[in-house]
Amino acid sequence: LLSEPVQTRREIGLQLGANAAIDPIHEDLTARIRALTGMDGVDVVIECVGNTIATAQAFSATKRGTTVLLFSVPKSGTTHPLSLEDVYQKELTIVGSIINPDTHQRAVDLINSGRIQLAPILTHRFPIERLKDAILMQMSSESLKVLVGSNYD
């Protein structure tokens, strides 16, 4: 299941294999997850945004035994009120993530194996002379991943 406010990103997520794509701005994310799974929540949540709203939504999607992976890079000083009772009652596992020396090689191996499709997520390409445009595009909600190189026109 994918939670994403931008329509084009939801569409790409569905193309890449998400069973459902939910708009967390206009839909009740927790209610949709419960309806789609037919149970109390999901087994694993990967939070990739880093803001307190997305983090709260991530924890609201949990059930007993869920693992919550906080994969995002939040702003320095960001805090989140966490119900320790929920952690206890639901037996949640909370995992932080940071890049490690093996990460890049594992990513390359996944790409080379064909298990990861890059084409749908490489949405824009810019020549080096248009670096400023590339940065602005990456900051917008119109892009997923932006490439900059000497071979792009």
State where each predicted segment sits.
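Adenosine-nucleotide cofactor-binding segment
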Residues: L1-Q57
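Hydrophobic residues in well-ordered beta-strands that form the structural core
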Residues: L2, L70, I94-G96
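Residues in the short beta-alpha loop(s) of Rossmann-like NAD(P)-binding domains
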Residues: P5-V6, P74, N100
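Conserved catalytic-site loops of classical short-chain dehydrogenases/reductases
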Residues: V44, T67-V68
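C-terminal hydrophobic helical "lid"/dimerization subdomain
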Residues: A56-S60, P101-D153
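Helix-to-beta-strand junctions that scaffold the AdoMet/dcAdoMet cofactor pocket
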Residues: T62-R64
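Glycine-centered, small-residue-biased loops immediately flanking beta-strands
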Residues: T66-T67, L144
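Rossmann-fold NAD(P)-binding glycine/threonine-rich loop
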Residues: V73-E91, A107-D109
